Amino acid sequence: MAEYNKVILMGNLTRDPDLRYTPAGLAVCEFPLAVHYRYRAHEEAKEDVCFINVVAFGRVAERSKERLRKGSCVLVDGRLSQRRWETPEGQKRSKYEVVANSVHFIDGGSGVVPGQEEDLPI
């Protein structure tokens, strides 16, 4: 059975990105994205907002931290991932997030932060 996991989102950061490093030294950057959806219902304009957490690794993470700020408009190309963990009390938790392969800066930036496997100039 063929499988396909691709997500493309455009939205605005709701806060500045957080950058941290794993014990192995891998950069990890997380930022929440507000994605708006506009539609009409019964001749009335409506809007929904979806808040999605995005996580980037390596070079994409470091460049995202350097260039992004709250309010930045970005286009994210990535995949949907489910993170699972257990609390100290033994409760199982999970959350969905988008793992970014690349982040395109729409306003105030130039270029793309490519995925780790790519070697494109910025």
Where are these regions (language model features)?
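Acidic, gly/ser/pro-rich intrinsically disordered tails
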Residues: 1-4, 18-24, 40-47, 62, ...
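Residue-level recognition of specific faces of alpha-helices
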Residues: 3-6, 30-32, 51-53, 77, ...
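Structural detector for short beta-strands of small beta-barrel domains
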Residues: 8-16
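Conserved positions in beta-strands of structured domains
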Residues: 14, 20, 57, 81, ...
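Short aromatic-glycine-enriched beta-strand elements
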Residues: 21-34, 94
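Disulfide-stabilized netrin-like
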Residues: 45-59
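Beta-rich strand-turn-strand
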Residues: 57-93, 106-107
